[in-house]
Amino acid sequence: MSSQYSNVENLSPQTIRQVMRELQEMENTPPEGIKVLINESDVTDIQALIDGPAGTPYAIGVFRVKLTLSKDFPQTPPKAYFLTKIFHPNVAANGEICVNTLKKDWKPDLGIKHILLTIKCLLIVPNPESALNEEAGKMLLERYDDYSQRARMMTEIHAQPAKCASTTSDAKDDDGPSTKKHAGLDKKLQDKKKEKLLKEKKRMLKRL
């Protein structure tokens, strides 16, 4: 990422206040399926959890996204990334998101909430015409069932709620050893699930 990103000192006090106000409003009244994670020490580092929309291959997942504000925000759009691995036409290998709202359609008054809602909409209606992941874009257009199966498998492996929750904050010892015990059990269940999915994938590849 460019050095112009994630530098709170370069933002005007007015912009910082505006961003913090919007983040606090979203924390108090969250949009459906979106939970914002506030970093009070650096408002240029904005993260959120987005629930996979029902009726999509992402439905069972929770996806962590990151917005980094440039020094010229809001005159220039932020950069947006999926931190959770995802198989999607408009998401590059490094997680960068391609959406017109953050390119040619950007307007300074759109705000953080609008960006996060746009990203959620992208999970419902991908745009294969401007694909950053060409394989996913081609598969969506030509073999939708295969695309859906691949996207669902990636979601089951990488976007489980427990996995996202474990990355939102460092582990705390407040609840004593039982918390760690449950975390260990969760990891074993995840490993078993991952092993099962890999076996299913191998069986599918043999059929091709």
From Swiss-Prot:
Example GO biological process: exit from mitosis
EC annotation from Swiss-Prot or TrEMBL: 2.3.2.23
Name of the protein described by the UniProt record: Ubiquitin-conjugating enzyme E2 S
UBC core domain location: 14-160
Active site: 98
SMART domains named in the record: UBCc (SM00212)
Extent of Basic residues compositional bias: 199-208
Organism taxonomic ancestry: Eukaryota, Metazoa, Ecdysozoa, Arthropoda, Hexapoda
Pfam families, per database record: UQ_con (PF00179)
Sorted UniProt keywords: ATP-binding, Cell cycle, Cell division, Nucleotide-binding, Transferase, Ubl conjugation pathway
InterPro entries: Ub_conjugating_enzyme, UBQ-conjugat_E2_core, UBQ-conjugating_AS, UBQ-conjugating_enzyme/RWD
Region: Disordered, residue numbers: 159-208
GO molecular-function terms, A-Z: ATP binding; ubiquitin conjugating enzyme activity
